[in-house]
Regions:
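C-terminal transmembrane helical hairpin of 12-TM major facilitator-type secondary transporters
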Residues: 278-286, 291-346
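Extracytoplasmic gate region of multi-pass secondary transporters
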Residues: 37-41, 232-284
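Core transmembrane helices of Major Facilitator Superfamily
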Residues: 30, 115-127, 332-343
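Helix-breaking motifs and short loop linkers at transmembrane-helix boundaries and internal kinks
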Residues: 49, 81, 102-108, 136, ...
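Paired small-residue
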Residues: 96, 107-115, 323-331
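Conserved MFS/SLC helix-loop-helix module at the cytosolic interface between two early adjacent transmembrane helices
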Residues: 68-106, 293, 299
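Helix-loop-helix hairpin linking two adjacent transmembrane segments in secondary transporters
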Residues: 146-201
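Cytoplasmic helix-loop-helix junction between adjacent transmembrane helices
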Residues: 112-150
Length: 421
């Protein structure tokens, strides 16, 4: 039936539909579920009477949940198909956000932020990994780069929406924000289940860019060489590099709005506008850097992005006036989601379309460890020093370590022998 509806003669390849829905999944799973906290944090922190350490602890709880499910979610997607895993993950994330809005204490909020993170991990990793099945190798960087812009659209929407909701609902504005995020995410879960397909062969199609006459056969789960994921030295190297991104960027993103308000002299509305500007600049980052990695290599792109982000974080810490904050936001926006896009494309290169979600889930374990540690460490440093600047400088230093680690990657990460498509 589906093969008749979505025929090979359709004017638009269904891979583009998959990419559009995948971008929407990222919008909810990361954009609303994780970065929504950045915009809501000042009001939520005041409403619940949280210290900086506790505020960082809520972010850490969310990221521990993400870490717990990202590896399992990727493996489940490889075995049972991304469609059902993505749908279930978004549903769990929506429930977690709804309950976050009902929280009355740090303990309640931490529990529900962890549940939200679990749903995010179970949906985001398979959504990006799914692109490896729908796009041939030479287009995977581009596709992943577009997919991660879901977070960019979220920054734009959050920058516009949250200040108005906070103004309109007063003391309970932060709760209403979480309710809105939950409703959007639940709707996306239903939409994703309706539209997503696990692989081109489900519709009698080939991956976008594949030559005519290529086989549409898929490998069954029991025939997959699972050990190729966990025994690959290159995959472990990628994971270790990914730690640096997780640790550094989440410090910047978690405390971005709070730093602007408490140390940069911004109002909530002005901070929201700068958050939106960051989102606009980040719209093309995955597309640009994904294409750069397709043309110049994954290694070159990773080194360049880490250096740009290290400079953005240090600028934010050392120049907390309007010009410095704006330049920092622009630089980070230009490179924001490029590292996840490059990592997703690299996993597709190394492991093939069926194992790509499992590989991405595995290296996301390392990424998640960095993310889980970052906000808590930053909050402790901020409470001890009474400023967020030292924590931001730490983020900058860790990003530089990521650049150094990337220099030791092989120049050509393509066509390795670890997979058999």
């Amino acid at each position: 039936m589906q093969k008749d509806i979505f025929s090979k003669t359709a004017p638009v390849h269904y891979a583009w539909v998959i990419l559009a829905v995948g971008t929407l999944v990222v919008f909810c799973a990361l954009g609303l579920a994780r970065f929504g906290y950045t915009m809501v944090l000042p009001a939520m922190q005041a409403g619940l009477g949280l210290s900086n350490t506790q505020a960082g602890g809520l972010a850490t709880a969310n990221l521990i949940g993400y870490l717990a499910l990202s590896v399992i979610g990727g493996a489940l997607a490889a075995r049972y198909g991304p469609r059902i895993v993505i749908t279930a993950g978004l549903t769990v994330a929506a429930a977690g956000m709804l309950l976050t809005g009902l929280s009355d204490s740090f303990a309640d909020a931490a529990a529900w932020r962890a549940i939200t993170g679990m749903g995010s991990g179970a949906s985001n990793v398979p959504a990006i990994g799914l692109l490896a099945a729908w796009f041939v190798q030479r287009r995977r960087g581009l596709a992943a780069g577009i997919g991660v812009t879901g977070s960019s659209f979220a920054l734009i929407v959050l920058g516009l929406l949250v200040p108005h909701v906070l103004d309109g609902y007063g003391w309970n504005g932060w709760r209403m924000c979480w309710f809105i995020f939950a409703g959007i995410t639940l709707g996306t879960a239903v939409f994703s289940f309706t539209i997503l397909r696990n692989c081109p062969s489900d519709l009698g199609l080939l991956p976008l860019g594949a030559p005519k006459g290529s086989s549409t056969a898929t490998v069954v789960a029991r025939e997959l060489n699972w050990s190729s994921v966990y025994r690959s030295g290159v995959v472990w190297h990628l994971g270790l590099i990914y730690v640096a991104f997780g640790f550094s960027y989440i410090i910047y993103m978690t405390f971005f709005t709070k730093y602007l308000i408490t140390e940069g002299g911004y109002t909530q509305g002005a901070a929201g506008r700068l958050f939106m500007i960051m989102g606009w600049f980040s719209l093309l980052c995955g597309l640009v850097w994904g294409s750069v990695s397709d043309r110049l290599g994954r290694k070159t792109a990773l080194v360049a992005v880490y250096i740009i982000q290290a400079f953005a974080f240090s600028l934010f810490a050392l120049w907390p006036s309007s010009p410095g904050c704006v330049l920092s936001a622009v630089l980070f926006g230009f490179s924001a989601w490029s590292i996840p896009a490059i990592m997703a494309a690299t996993c597709g290169d190394l492991l093939g379309p069926r194992l790509a979600p499992a590989g991405l889930g595995f290296i996301t374990l390392f990424f998640g460890i960095g993310q889980a540690a970052g906000p808590g460490v930053a909050g402790i440093i901020a409470d001890a020093s009474q400023t967020l600047s030292p924590a931001l400088l730490l983020a900058s230093g860790v990003a530089l370590l990521g650049a150094v680690g990337s220099l030791f990657l092989r120049s050509d990460l393509r066509q390795q022998s670890v997979h058999a498509d």
